[in-house]
């Protein structure tokens, strides 16, 4: 399976974040991809200790080097997402922007 980095905006609403992560992971799996989702462990350090948070973000970005593609989800673009996309461009990774309608369709929500 190809590995795909899942890029989407983090939020402060943990419950909604988990729901979105599950949707995007399932979407990637249904597309035959192995999702790489650093949000699962980055959230543990979210804004608790600035040094830990920065290290967690850098660790997440380092996973781009082992991925075959990056898929960008969500309506808004954050600074972190822009950085992940910039790194992906430098690595010549294919970048795919995926709308919520595409996710709903693939997951049979229509």
Where are the model-predicted features located?
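Catalytic phosphate/metal-binding cores of nucleic-acid and nucleotide-processing enzymes, i.e., regions
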Residues: 1-110
């Amino acid at each position: 399976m190809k590995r795909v980095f899942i890029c989407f905006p983090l939020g402060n609403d943990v419950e909604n974040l988990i729901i979105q992560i599950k949707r995007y992971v399932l979407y990637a799996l249904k597309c035959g991809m192995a999702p790489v989702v650093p949000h699962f462990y980055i959230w543990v350090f979210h804004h608790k200790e600035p040094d830990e948070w920065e290290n967690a973000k850098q660790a997440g970005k380092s996973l781009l080097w082992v991925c075959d593609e990056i898929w960008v989800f969500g309506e808004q673009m954050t600074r972190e997402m822009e950085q992940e996309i910039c790194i992906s461009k430098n690595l010549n990774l294919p970048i795919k922007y995926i709308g919520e309608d595409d996710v709903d369709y693939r997951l049979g929500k229509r």
